[in-house]
């Protein structure tokens, strides 16, 4: 059953490669995501450093890091995504980024160097084996390195509505594959056994009618925004 769920999610993204690539250029919600993630990637990466992009999708953040001079490995379970990324890499003539086909959490760690920064944007909520995946991430981060992860916000009012409506009438889009919701502190508790400590968290949202309505209420962002990104540091000696 776990494999079937994973394959369904991977299949959905594989079937929509161009759609997800174009969203970063056309969708207000994806533009907001890129702006927030861009700030974090500039802050926590350095030229010549090593980065891993787990669940790289169409490679938006992998190429962003590569353009900053970072050595990047992008990994995704959708083969069509990887092929599209490799075509883009070849077209641009980049030598500091490469892409690997692999499904979480069954990644061959021996093929990867430990990373100064490991990122995973809107990926782990689809993975049944959440703790196993987080343990893998932590192992791949260097001591005092940085782990940046985004997940659906469990406190979001719009997410609560989505969960209820999906339970009443299952949706046909990507939301039906979501398995996990969290908060920054809940995620920190899951990562604590691996020496990871929360440094900062930012909230953002998909720009839907419901999200716009939530923002007009002037409630705390942890209630109005349906996604968060947490930045974790691996403490010395771990």
Regions picked out by a protein language model, each given a short descriptive name:
Residues 131-143:
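A short glycine-rich, Lys/Arg-flanked "PGG" loop and its adjoining helix->strand segment in the class I
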Residues 119:
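A conserved beta-strand element that flanks and buttresses the S-adenosyl-L-methionine
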Residues 170-186:
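Acceptor-substrate binding/catalytic loop of class I
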Residues 58-106:
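Class I SAM-dependent methyltransferase SAM/SAH-binding core
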Residues 122-126:
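Short catalytic micro-motifs in class I SAM-dependent methyltransferases
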Residues 1-45, 48-57, 148-170, 214, 218, 222:
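Conserved class I S-adenosyl-L-methionine
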């Amino acid at each position: 059953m776990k494999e079937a769920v994973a394959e369904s999610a991977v299949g959905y993204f594989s079937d929509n490669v161009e759609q997800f690539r174009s969203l970063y250029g056309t969708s207000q919600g994806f533009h907001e995501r890129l702006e927030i993630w861009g700030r974090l990637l500039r802050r926590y990466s350095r030229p010549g450093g090593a980065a891993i992009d787990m669940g790289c999708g169409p490679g938006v953040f992998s190429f962003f890091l590569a353009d900053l001079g970072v050595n990047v490995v992008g990994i995704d379970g959708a083969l069509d995504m990887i092929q599209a990324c490799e075509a883009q890499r070849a077209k641009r003539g980049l030598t500091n980024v490469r892409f690997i086909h692999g499904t979480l959490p069954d990644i061959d760690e021996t093929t990867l160097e430990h990373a100064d920064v490991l990122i995973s944007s809107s990926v782990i909520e689809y993975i049944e084996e959440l703790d196993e995946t987080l343990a893998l991430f932590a192992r791949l981060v260097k001591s005092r390195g940085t782990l940046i992860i985004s997940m659906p916000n469990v406190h979001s009012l719009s997410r609560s509505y989505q969960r209820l409506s999906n339970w009443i009438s299952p949706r046909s889009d990507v939301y039906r594959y979501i398995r996990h919701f969290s908060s920054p502190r809940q995620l920190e508790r899951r990562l604590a056994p691996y020496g990871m400590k929360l440094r900062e968290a930012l909230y953002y949202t998909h720009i839907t009618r419901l999200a716009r309505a939530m923002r007009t209420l002037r409630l705390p962002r942890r209630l109005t925004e349906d996604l968060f990104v947490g930045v974790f540091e691996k403490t010395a000696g771990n």
